[in-house]
């Protein structure tokens, strides 16, 4: 029996176990440090989904190859030195440092491409077998997200998006703090770029997913206010899960 046939049988068994509701997938979107794990925990749905996040594959590769998950520091130094180079010749010491951080950025890109391939393989495997899943990311690339959503819909998934709206400066500070504590920190310039693109995507996302499948959760105040905002989407999430 081929692997595709085995997957089809498993899929039918799971479909029978969940009844006519079928499978759900959620794009969990927003800038880094938005409190997305808090949202899932408060809603109590995290155990009903497999969470797919490139970081799950990227971070181990970073530690194995670079010995750090803090990508901000050497990236910032790279751009600082490049700016100096554009104005004058680098000293021998600066040139050596520049080549070093440039090499680190090259390794980072190679590792990220490998992590993307692993991430895509995980998503494809879940779709082939059939299971609820969450794609955790920023959703800054509108065309990619909507293309993926169409593919998941074709595979029989009911798709939604939860977008956590956080202030860009708060996102950058939490990103840097995570790096200081040994976690992964991306170059803050990436967050600035994402923050300029995301606001223009919100209404298109709402139109694409529909009012009953797009949930915007502001997180620009106190933690208690954020928890209250999460509660505001609970009825809609419950309706989505039960549809």
Give names to the regions the model predicted.
Residues 17-23, 125-127:
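Phosphate-binding P-loop
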Residues 26-27:
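Short hydrophobic/aromatic beta-strand immediately N-terminal to the Walker A/P-loop
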Residues 40-131, 143:
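Conserved substrate/cofactor phosphate-moiety recognition/catalytic segment
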Residues 169-243:
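Conserved GTP-binding G-domain of TRAFAC-class P-loop NTPases and closely related GTPase folds
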Residues 35:
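Conserved glycine(s) of the Walker
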Residues 31-32:
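The conserved Walker
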């Amino acid at each position: 029996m081929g692997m595709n046939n085995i997957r089809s049988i498993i899929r039918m068994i799971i479909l029978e176990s969940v009844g006519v509701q079928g499978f759900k997938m959620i794009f969990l979107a927003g800038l880094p440090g938005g409190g997305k794990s808090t949202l899932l925990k408060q809603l109590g749905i995290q155990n009903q989904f497999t969470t797919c996040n490139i970081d799950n594959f990227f971070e181990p590769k970073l530690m194995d190859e670079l010995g750090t998950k803090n990508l901000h520091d050497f990236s910032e130094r790279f751009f600082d030195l490049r700016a100096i180079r554009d104005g004058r010749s680098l000293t021998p010491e600066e040139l050596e440092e520049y080549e070093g951080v440039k090499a680190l950025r090259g390794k980072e890109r190679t590792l990220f491409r490998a992590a993307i391939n692993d991430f895509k393989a995980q998503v494809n495997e879940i779709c082939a077998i059939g299971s609820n899943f969450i794609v955790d990311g920023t959703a800054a690339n509108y065309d990619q997200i909507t293309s993926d959503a169409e593919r998941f819909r074709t595979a029989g998934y009911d798709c939604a998006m939860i977008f956590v709206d956080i202030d860009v400066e708060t996102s950058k500070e939490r990103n840097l703090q995570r790096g200081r504590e040994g976690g992964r920190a991306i170059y803050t310039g990436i967050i600035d770029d994402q923050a300029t693109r995301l606001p223009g995507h919100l209404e298109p996302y709402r139109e694409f997913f529909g009012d009953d499948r797009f949930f915007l959760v502001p997180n620009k105040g106190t933690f208690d206010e954020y928890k209250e905002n999460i509660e505001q989407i609970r009825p809609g999430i419950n309706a989505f899960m039960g549809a």
